[in-house]
C-alpha cells in the first residue's frame, strides 16, 4: 500500500480505486493491489487488460455506492454504474481486501471488472451502423441516398515490386505514393489485410452494353482493368452516399464527408465514430441530426470458445429519418441546364402556397466528387476557380433591378402617395429632377402614352418609378420597406443573407 492509502478503510479505498477508472489512472490502480494475492499480475499486463476493456467500452460518469462491509471476511459489497458506448451498465459486486502493517490492499482479478468475467474471457463491442436517411423531392424522387461505388484496396503480401506497383497505383488513382504508404503502414495492417486506398466510381455493365457508351464510362472501365492487372490490387463494391442530380442540386443538397478529429471532439457523445460521415453543407448539414440516425451497439462477454456468455449493455439501432423537400426534380434540372454556364441563382416558387420548387446556383460543382474523395489538387482547383463553383449564390443578396418596381408601386399605392391613373407625361427617354442632379439622368427604353402606373409596369419605365419614389419620400419608403421585412432574417430553413435596400444606413 502507498503511504497516502495507509489505514484508509476498505470502503474508502474501493471508491478511490473505481474513480481512477474513467481518468485512465491505471498505474494508481495497480499501486493499490496486493500483487501476490492478485495472481502476481504484472503492472504491464494489468494496465493492458484494464485499459483495453474500459477504454474499449468508453467508460465515463462512474458512480459507486457501498452496500456493506464484512469486517471478518474483509469484503466490500458495492453497487456501481457507469456510462458506456452502449448505454449504462450497472451491477452489484464484491471486493476482497487483505491487511498488512501498511494498511489494506485490494485483491484483484477479472471479476472486479465485471462479476462474471474470467481471465479467459473477452469483452466485445459490436456496432450496427445506422442507415442515413434519404433526401427526397416532393414526388419521392431521390436527391440523396444509397449508391454503390468501387473501393480500390491493396493486399500488401501480394504486392510484387512494391515501389513500382505503388507508383502505378498512385498514378491511376491520382494520389501520391506517400498517401498509399501511409495507409499501408497503419498498425492494424497485416500481409493478408485488405487495405482500402481510394473509392472510385463503379462501372455498371448496363452502361457498357449501350450502342454508344459514354466516354467517361469507357475511361473508368479501362482504369479498373489497369488496376486489376497489378498483383495485390483488389476492387470491391462499397455502399456510398449518392447524389443523382449532381451539379444541378449540389448547393441545395450539399454533401457528406468522413468525420475529422475536430468533428469527433466537437460532437463528442453524439454517437459519431471514426467510421462515421457527417453532413457538411446544404440539406445534408442542415438536417444532420435527423438524417444520421443512431448506431446500435452491444457490449458482451465472449468465452474462450468464442461464444457469447453474457450481454452487458445494448442500444438498438435507430435508422435516420427521410427528409422530403418541396423541390421538383424536373424543374430543378431544367433551371440548371438553362443557366449552368452563367453566374446566377434561380428560385422557383408556388405563388399560392409559397412552396419553393427549385433552388439553383450556377456554376456548380459535383457533390459526388466529395464522396469519392478530392485530391488536394482538385480541392485547390475548385476553390481557385474564378467562376467560384463552390459559392452558393441563392443564399446571398442581389441587386433586384426592375423587380423592385412592383414594390415601389405597392408602397406608393398603400401610402396614397401615387394615383395609378395620374399621367406623368411623356418626357422622352432621359430625365432628371432638376440641375441639383448634375450630369445624372434617369433613362428608359420606351416612349409610350399615357404614362400611368399600368403602362409603366408593362414597359418597365425607370423614369416613372423615379418620379413615384420622389412622391413617396424617404421616410415613407424606409418605413414601408421595413414593414415588408427588409433588413430582417428570412424565416426559412436555409440561412439566407438579410435583405437590404441600401448600402448605407438609409436611403440618401
Where on the chain are the PLM-derived regions?
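Alpha-helix N-cap/N′ positions at the starts of helices
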Residues: 5-13, 147, 164, 390, ...
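Extracytoplasmic/periplasmic proteins that interact with beta-lactams or build/remodel peptidoglycan
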Residues: 49-345, 365-389, 397
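Short, low-complexity N-terminal intrinsically disordered segments enriched in polar/charged residues
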Residues: 1-19, 23
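Juxtamembrane and targeting peptides
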Residues: 1-5, 136, 424
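Short helix-capping and inter-helix turn/linker motifs at the boundaries of alpha-helical repeat units
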Residues: 4-8, 326, 385, 455
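Short solvent-exposed beta->alpha transition segments
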Residues: 12-16, 26-74
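Bacterial peptidoglycan biogenesis and beta-lactam-recognition machinery
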Residues: 24, 35-39, 142-145, 160, ...
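Beta-lactam-recognizing serine transpeptidase/beta-lactamase-like catalytic domain environment
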Residues: 302-313, 351-402, 407-508
